[in-house]
């Protein structure tokens, strides 16, 4: 599977060929997680509508929920203005974080809202 050249030409990748992907819950607007993608992971996501990412530590692709059952159905994918990050607008089934919480950003508040 290959990424459409028109999309690939707009992406800015790091030295490892990766770019960041932010998953946002469609119904709440919550930022769920940040992961890495490469062209293949993005192509798979666009083709299947399943959040597919690249693990730097395992050096392999993974589909969110493939083992946990906590799946992401991808409704939209947007490219940011710099071309180095994609936003996935998803329906999250179950926890998004590997710790079992709904979002990876709910436990360590460094500055709370007034």
Swiss-Prot record:
<keyword id="KW-0479">Metal-binding</keyword>
<feature type="binding site">
    <location>
        <position position="81"/>
    </location>
    <ligand>
        <name>Zn(2+)</name>
    </ligand>
</feature>
<keyword id="KW-0460">Magnesium</keyword>
<dbReference type="InterPro" id="IPR002496">
    <property type="entry name" value="PRib_AMP_CycHydrolase_dom"/>
</dbReference>
<comment type="similarity">
    <text>Belongs to the PRA-CH family.</text>
</comment>
<keyword id="KW-0378">Hydrolase</keyword>
<keyword id="KW-0028">Amino-acid biosynthesis</keyword>
<comment type="pathway">
    <text>Amino-acid biosynthesis; L-histidine biosynthesis; L-histidine from 5-phospho-alpha-D-ribose 1-diphosphate: step 3/9.</text>
</comment>
<feature type="binding site">
    <location>
        <position position="104"/>
    </location>
    <ligand>
        <name>Zn(2+)</name>
    </ligand>
</feature>
<comment type="subunit">
    <text>Homodimer.</text>
</comment>
<keyword id="KW-0963">Cytoplasm</keyword>
<keyword id="KW-0862">Zinc</keyword>
<dbReference type="GO" id="GO:0000105">
    <property type="term" value="P:L-histidine biosynthetic process"/>
</dbReference>
<dbReference type="GO" id="GO:0005737">
    <property type="term" value="C:cytoplasm"/>
</dbReference>
<protein>
    <recommendedName>
        <fullName>Phosphoribosyl-AMP cyclohydrolase</fullName>
        <ecNumber>3.5.4.19</ecNumber>
    </recommendedName>
</protein>
<comment type="function">
    <text>Catalyzes the hydrolysis of the adenine ring of phosphoribosyl-AMP.</text>
</comment>
<keyword id="KW-0368">Histidine biosynthesis</keyword>
<feature type="binding site">
    <location>
        <position position="80"/>
    </location>
    <ligand>
        <name>Mg(2+)</name>
    </ligand>
</feature>
<feature type="binding site">
    <location>
        <position position="84"/>
    </location>
    <ligand>
        <name>Mg(2+)</name>
    </ligand>
</feature>
<dbReference type="InterPro" id="IPR038019">
    <property type="entry name" value="PRib_AMP_CycHydrolase_sf"/>
</dbReference>
<dbReference type="GO" id="GO:0000287">
    <property type="term" value="F:magnesium ion binding"/>
</dbReference>
<dbReference type="InterPro" id="IPR026660">
    <property type="entry name" value="PRA-CH"/>
</dbReference>
<dbReference type="GO" id="GO:0008270">
    <property type="term" value="F:zinc ion binding"/>
</dbReference>
<feature type="binding site">
    <location>
        <position position="97"/>
    </location>
    <ligand>
        <name>Zn(2+)</name>
    </ligand>
</feature>
<dbReference type="Pfam" id="PF01502">
    <property type="entry name" value="PRA-CH"/>
</dbReference>
<feature type="binding site">
    <location>
        <position position="82"/>
    </location>
    <ligand>
        <name>Mg(2+)</name>
    </ligand>
</feature>
<dbReference type="GO" id="GO:0004635">
    <property type="term" value="F:phosphoribosyl-AMP cyclohydrolase activity"/>
</dbReference>
């Amino acid at each position: 599977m290959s990424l459409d050249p028109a999309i690939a030409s707009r992406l800015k990748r790091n030295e490892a060929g990766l770019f960041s992907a932010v998953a946002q819950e469609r119904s709440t607007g919550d930022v769920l997680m940040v992961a890495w993608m490469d062209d293949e992971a993005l192509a798979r996501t666009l083709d299947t509508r399943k959040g597919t990412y690249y693990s730097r530590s395992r050096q392999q692709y993974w589909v969110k929920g493939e083992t946990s059952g906590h799946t992401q159905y991808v409704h939209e994918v947007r490219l940011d203005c710099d071309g180095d990050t994609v936003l996935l607008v998803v329906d999250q089934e179950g926890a998004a974080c590997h710790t079992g919480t709904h979002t990876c950003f709910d436990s360590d508040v460094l500055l709370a809202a007034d």
